[in-house]
Amino acid sequence: MSLAFKIFFPQTLRALSRKELCLFRKHHWRDVRQFSQWSETDLLHGHPLFLRRKPVLSFQGSHLRSRATYLVFLPGLHVGLCSGPCEMAEQRFCVDYAKRGTAGCKKCKEKIVKGVCRIGKVVPNPFSESGGDMKEWYHIKCMFEKLERARATTKKIEDLTELEGWEELEDNEKEQITQHIADLSSKAAGTPKKKAVVQAKLTTTGQVTSPVKGASFVTSTNPRKFSGFSAKPNNSGEAPSSPTPKRSLSSSKCDPRHKDCLLREFRKLCAMVADNPSYNTKTQIIQDFLRKGSAGDGFHGDVYLTVKLLLPGVIKTVYNLNDKQIVKLFSRIFNCNPDDMARDLEQGDVSETIRVFFEQSKSFPPAAKSLLTIQEVDEFLLRLSKLTKEDEQQQALQDIASRCTANDLKCIIRLIKHDLKMNSGAKHVLDALDPNAYEAFKASRNLQDVVERVLHNAQEVEKEPGQRRALSVQASLMTPVQPMLAEACKSVEYAMKKCPNGMFSEIKYDGERVQVHKNGDHFSYFSRSLKPVLPHKVAHFKDYIPQAFPGGHSMILDSEVLLIDNKTGKPLPFGTLGVHKKAAFQDANVCLFVFDCIYFNDVSLMDRPLCERRKFLHDNMVEIPNRIMFSEMKRVTKALDLADMITRVIQEGLEGLVLKDVKGTYEPGKRHWLKVKKDYLNEGAMADTADLVVLGAFYGQGSKGGMMSIFLMGCYDPGSQKWCTVTKCAGGHDDATLARLQNELDMVKISKDPSKIPSWLKVNKIYYPDFIVPDPKKAAVWEITGAEFSKSEAHTADGISIRFPRCTRIRDDKDWKSATNLPQLKELYQLSKEKADFTVVAGDEGSSTTGGSSEENKGPSGSAVSRKAPSKPSASTKKAEGKLSNSNSKDGNMQTAKPSAMKVGEKLATKSSPVKVGEKRKAADETLCQTKVLLDIFTGVRLYLPPSTPDFSRLRRYFVAFDGDLVQEFDMTSATHVLGSRDKNPAAQQVSPEWIWACIRKRRLVAPC
């Protein structure tokens, strides 16, 4: 009996039958003779199955992969080779035991411990130009969980023998894998059947060929897609798929000689919009003009150009001109005194200054009648944007001014300054165009495309009345999409209410937000404000993004870019991305943390829920360590879990968290995400705060033009005996307070003149103020609160500044001696960078750091308080108290300089054991009250409290509980505050019981009352 044999490959071993043998006689005879290279492993159809580890010789040099080959000896005269090359190049799997414990599971991201059985998926190596394969490792359970969710047509493990290396496994692992295979098969019983195996053919020379002409054996590079998501382009025709044609609908319908194109009519429209305070009325006025025109017989102007000019602050063009330069150039054109124009400019409106002096000019009078068109104005603005030399700019301005009336020129100057002063934004203008125009513009930032699609839809309606088509909202590649934003979240309960479906909690990276656009080999990077990002921050990403997204030829990514330390793997602080700062960190890389994908391979993903977008991102992106990485994100469904995360983030000194609804779509420009930062919690109790002196002021702009509305804040340096600048503060005052401060503040106008900067002030040139205080020791003290203390070399207080400053209180009870000085400011900065001993608990709405409260511990106002825990203050707390607490000042005021993350010596709360859901509220409150440390409101306050005071025992208990010191009557001279008569200590401040309760309610010291 002669021997015949059949060669199988792992994917088709069980699927093929004897009928599928392809006859040949001589080609593999050499392999059959070398029995010593084969070992018996199993039986197939009752016949012995042999395994050969070396590749079959006849396959060497062919396109087939080298792998374990199965040989079956069968009785008969025929021999055969099965499985065509298409099947042989399919996805492969292997199995072994982890050798070093360094490889991570591709699914769960955990390290696979040394000696643990693991399954590998053999995939093309995207990091090698020469091709080749690499292995993605999984835990056994993780692999089958991934296969369970894979598409029905995806290759799955159907038999143990399909795993290369299975014969080296222990029996336990074999049984475990076999059980997983059985479970997978039962769950996939209802899925579509696998496509039939393509039969291979043999040529007379023994070469394997495909019966399909031109069949390709190259593995597809298309992106992987998860079940239930079909990434197919929308062929509705609404999305911009090609460049806008040269002859647009907007310009084709325009009659340049019609008065709707005159700048005069445009000015009238702006004036009407500005005169109406109602936003709905503003929109209606613009809508009427775009539909009916100035004569009421229909609009005959250029819709796109009109809308574009109505939005100079949105569609911005750089003209390289500031207010002083404009005044300087027009003083030459009008032949008038530049100093007079500069003084008038202090009123805050450069366009009004130009109008006034244009009307007064004798040598260059305005035109008698306005005949300029908006097309001519647009051409002038385009020309001006290309000029950088003063002489050229002056000539261009002179040319256009010679044809302008005074009001025409005023309007043009406002267009140059990107502010028509209509008190209306893009939404009010675009809503007049179409109800969906604003949303479409936010998504694509392509105004011309939006206008063209609106006009196209209007044409369709004219042809087929009643068939109105809604304007689609689509992203436009290589054009920045307005980023989705986050609103402030002040409590855990508010977050749970806003995200009822659960949320993704993501670390808020302290970097710079970047929107990445890729179209083939072309890349664009846009900042949060939609401006191009500086090249040194993003230039190298073009080398790594193709590796991270091997299947993506076009995409839009939402991400954060920051500098990451290669040794520790931790991000470096905000501001280190600058050229000079980055040079100081030699062992650091600029890393892109990707947290969203809104466009991929010509498909917009904005209308997909976040959970699907995140899954899509993980399926299509490969992390490149310290270059392109996923942002850290965790799914949260319980309030206690969220509270724990907030606590951990604040304790680690990170910026905060961003919370996103798992079902939320990507809404450009909408604040539908939530951000949690320490200065939002507990009504700002965790914010960085300092008491600073008002050293100078600056003129405001717009509605605050001509008045002091921005203030230069600083502190005293005892070492140099000079005053240093800390920050510029423009927020915190309402209009009434600002109006009052114009008269209350003692200021001297110096108009940023360097020669008038006093010797006692250390200030850099960029912060020369318009006004300066004559004597800083008599200046006002304000409490300035910000997100955090930061480093800014532009300020002279040892480079310390405050990020996002605002004035939270005018400290009438303090003078320059009791304000924060430079050594104290340095201490506050150091404390703010240390880990905060702070715990967030899931309590009532608006009290994210206080949890609950028991009725017996409520003050007269009903504010929640609790008993002081019997814990000793930490060493750092004592140190801070010793450095910053001055119990007595010359005028009797208490020193209350505040630290950043906490008030000095203050612990908002200690860690408490989590309360299980379902326990009674009272029990939870008692637990929190037993473990929580009170605010140190009265630190440094020494109070004489007469025993005859009504409610004496209760006042004493609360005052001492909040870290106050009571003095006896014989020691009244050491008191800083006295309740009652001050005869024995006139220097002490006289207070009342209401003052104690007011301090407890507001959680800080208030002015004596």
Swiss-Prot record:
The keyword DNA repair applies. It comes from Homo sapiens (Human). Changing K410E: Nearly abolishes ligase activity with blunt-ended DNA, but not with nicked DNA. Its cofactor is Mg(2+). Changing K537N: In MTDPS20; may affect exon 9 splicing; decreased interaction with POLG; does not rescue cerebellar defects in a LIG3 deficiency zebrafish model. Isoform 3 interacts (via BRCT domain) with the nuclear DNA-repair protein XRCC1. Interacts with POLG. Interacts with POLB. Residues 277-280, 318-323, 388-391, 421-427 are annotated as: Interaction with DNA. Zn(2+) binds at C105, C108, H139, C142. This is DNA ligase 3. Changing D717N: In a colorectal cancer sample; somatic mutation. The PARP-type zinc finger is required for DNA ligase activity. One of its GO terms (biological process) is cell division. It is an enzyme of class 6 (ligase). Testis, thymus, prostate and heart. The gene is LIG3. Mg(2+) 2 binds at E655. A zinc finger (PARP-type) spans 93-185. Isoform 3 functions as a heterodimer with DNA-repair protein XRCC1 in the nucleus and can correct defective DNA strand-break repair and sister chromatid exchange following treatment with ionizing radiation and alkylating agents. Isoform 1 is targeted to mitochondria, where it functions as a DNA ligase in mitochondrial base-excision DNA repair. It comes from the Eukaryota. Gene3D superfamilies: 3.30.1490.70, BRCT domain, DNA ligase, ATP-dependent, N-terminal domain, DNA ligase/mRNA capping enzyme, Nucleic acid-binding proteins, Zinc finger, PARP-type. GO terms for molecular function: ATP binding; DNA binding; DNA ligase (ATP) activity; DNA ligase activity; zinc ion binding. SMART domains: BRCT, zf-PARP. Residues 884-898 have a biased composition (Polar residues). Disulfide bonds: none annotated. It is linked to Mitochondrial DNA depletion syndrome 20, MNGIE type: An autosomal recessive mitochondrial disorder characterized by severe gut dysmotility, muscle weakness and atrophy, neurological abnormalities including epilepsy, migraine, stroke-like episodes, learning difficulties or cognitive decline, and neurogenic bladder. Brain imaging usually shows diffuse leukoencephalopathy and may show cerebellar atrophy. Disease onset can range from infancy to the teenage years. It holds the Pfam family zf-PARP.
